[in-house]
Every structure is written in structure tokens, then in C-alpha cells.
């Protein structure tokens, strides 16, 4: 058969005990590569598919692909089939912003540099049906102060259970900080500027203390001794900020968020004791739900709504 590439996808869920063995998708990729080679398969690295070959003037069975390596093109024949496992297109600013204009160059991405739409466009050129390409998930817990996923994201997400996130132009909250990722990001984009998460020393449970330490060490999360310092540093209206913090803390004390319906953790305390921990937050593209259309057997569907013989899709490419 033809070559099989194993490429990164957005993320994987790995049991906590497995993290030390090779966190997230890396351990999966390495294990698959090892099994392929044990079975006598070959992996062609730095080899980019540029065309899918189909019988019948690009309407029939997929018979292989043309790929480029070191400036040279090679045709690979597939006797059983071709699997599209090219991942998402989160790093492809031109393509993603064509689907969702909000996701321009001002929005970062948690993915690796190879997460482009190249493989998807090769498939579309071969008559594959693209499905819901504008359904691109953003991650609301990242900071514009660092590249990619960064080290502060785990702290921002953990502290969202305890801390308010405010609009620096008003000093006010704008969303339930524990809402789903889409609603959170949509609300952030509506504000239109990076937001401020304001946590405090009384709201650092043991299970996320290491995340805070990492964010502080990187300079992404910063310590402040008062609301006045925060307002001065980030040009936040002080009166609005104080009123919001008083209102939020009253909700925490009462155990009911009358502003946005947030469910407080049982160990949540009012955000009143310095040091305050402030982190700028802004969404980053995280996962592409759209991709090539497949059926229940992973067969890729063509523009005629019929399965394309010899072509399969897997992972974030679908």
C-alpha cells in the first residue's frame, strides 16, 4: 500500500499517570510509528501530499497520491486505501479567517506550526465534501502575553472557578466564568480587548498552586497589593472595579451569583486578600470541529454525497 503519515491533532486526553511517559499526543504518535515499523511499514518524513489520485477523471476510486520531498514529486499508489489524518487548520490564519472573520492574525493558536489547511485543501480539490469548516473552537483561558498554549492557561482555567474576569474598559464582569468555551469566547470577542482575571491568595487551592507558580515565574500572571494598583497598571476605572469586586464578593459570600449564574466552588472565598493575581486573557484557536465529511465507517464523502471508494478520514481532519 501507500505511505501512512501519523500527524498531530489538537489534543488528546491521557490518564494522569501516563503524562510522565510522554504527555498528550506525542506518546500516541510514537507508539503508532513503532507499530507501523514493526509491521514492515515505512514512514516518509518531510513528505507533503499535494494531490489525491482518483480514477475516472477525478470522480472514481482514490488510487494514491502525489507527494513532494526535497523539491521532487513522487506518485504513491495505494492498493487498499488512503487515510486523511492531517489534523486541523488552527494555525492557517488565511483559511480560518475566511471561515470566521474574527479569527484573524490578532488571535493566537494553541497548535503546532504544521496545523494548516494544506491537507484539507488537497482533499477538497479532489471532490471531497467539506463540512462545517467555520466551526472552530477557541480556548478562552489563554494569555496574549505568551505564544501557543503557554504556561498560564492551566492557572487561568483553574482560577475561573474562584475569580472574576473583567472588562478593563469598565471594570465590570461580562460573562459567567464557568460557562462553556464557545459562550466564553464569544463574550470576549464581543468586548474586543484582552480581559483581566483577578484572583487572590485565599483562592489558590493546593491542586492548582503549581500552575500559579509557573504563571508567575513566566511573568504572565502578576502580583498586586491593591485594587488601586491594578486599576493604575491596566487603566481600569477604579470606581467601576471596586463596585464590581464588592458585588462579586457579596455573591460569593451568599453562595449565589445573581449577576451571571456562576456556580461557586464550596471552598471559594471572597476576593479581598492581597496579593491579587492578575492575568490578561484572550482566546486562541484550539480545535477545528469542521473538516471532511465521513460516514460511520470513516469513509470520506464526496460532493455527490456518496462515499469515495479508497478514501478514509480520521481525527481532527474530519
Indicate where each model-derived feature is located:
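Glycine-rich loop(s) and the adjacent beta-strand/alpha-helix scaffold that form part
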Residues: 69-143
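An anion/pyrophosphate-binding glycine-rich loop and adjacent beta-alpha core
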Residues: 116, 120-236, 240
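Hydrophobic "anchor" residues
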Residues: 62, 173, 300-301
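Short, acidic, Ser/Thr-enriched surface-loop or helix-capping motifs
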Residues: 57, 68, 167-168, 295-296, ...
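Short Gly/Pro-enriched turn/cap motifs at secondary-structure boundaries
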Residues: 12-19, 44, 110-112, 152-157, ...
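Conserved redox-cofactor binding core of oxidoreductases
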Residues: 1-73, 93-94, 143-144, 252-273
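A glycine-rich dinucleotide-binding beta-alpha-beta segment and adjacent secondary-structure elements
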Residues: 51, 240-318
Amino acid at each position: 500500500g501507500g505511505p501512512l503519515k501519523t500527524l498531530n491533532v489538537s489534543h488528546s486526553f491521557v490518564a494522569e499517570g501516563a503524562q510522565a511517559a510522554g504527555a498528550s499526543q506525542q506518546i500516541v504518535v510514537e507508539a503508532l510509528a513503532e507499530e507501523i515499523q514493526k509491521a514492515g511499514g515505512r514512514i516518509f518524513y518531510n513528505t507533503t501530499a499535494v494531490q489525491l489520485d482518483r480514477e475516472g477523471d477525478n470522480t472514481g476510486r482514490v488510487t494514491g497520491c502525489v507527494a513532494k520531498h526535497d523539491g521532487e514529486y513522487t506518485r504513491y499508489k495505494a492498493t487498499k486505501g488512503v487515510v486523511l489524518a492531517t489534523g486541523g487548520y488552527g494555525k492557517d490564519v488565511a483559511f480560518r479567517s475566511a471561515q470566521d472573520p474574527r479569527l484573524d492574525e490578532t488571535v493566537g493558536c494553541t497548535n503546532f506550526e504544521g496545523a494548516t489547511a494544506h491537507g484539507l485543501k488537497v482533499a477538497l480539490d479532489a471532490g471531497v465534501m467539506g463540512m462545517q469548516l467555520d466551526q472552530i473552537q477557541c480556548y478562552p483561558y489563554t494569555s496574549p502575553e505568551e505564544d501557543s498554549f503557554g504556561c498560564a492557561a492551566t492557572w487561568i482555567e483553574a482560577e475561573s472557578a474562584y475569580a472574576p474576569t473583567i472588562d478593563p474598559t469598565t471594570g465590570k464582569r461580562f460573562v459567567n466564568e464557568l460557562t462553556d468555551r464557545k459562550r466564553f469566547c464569544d463574550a470576549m470577542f464581543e468586548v474586543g480587548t484582552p480581559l483581566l482575571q483577578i484572583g487572590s491568595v485565599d483562592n489558590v487551592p493546593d491542586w492548582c498552586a503549581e500552575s500559579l507558580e509557573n504563571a508567575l515565574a513566566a511573568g504572565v500572571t502578576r502580583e498586586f497589593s491593591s485594587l488601586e494598583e491594578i486599576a493604575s497598571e491596566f487603566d481600569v476605572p477604579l470606581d467601576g472595579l471596586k463596585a464590581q469586586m464588592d458585588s462579586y464578593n457579596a455573591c460569593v459570600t451568599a453562595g449565589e451569583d445573581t449577576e451571571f449564574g456562576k456556580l461557586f466552588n464550596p471552598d471559594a472565598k471572597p476576593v479581598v486578600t492581597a496579593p491579587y493575581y492578575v492575568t490578561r486573557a484572550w482566546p486562541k484557536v484550539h480545535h477545528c470541529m469542521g473538516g471532511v465529511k465521513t460516514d460511520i465507517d470513516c469513509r470520506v464523502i464526496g460532493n455527490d454525497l456518496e462515499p469515495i471508494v479508497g478514501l478514509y478520514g480520521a481525527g481532527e481532519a474530519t
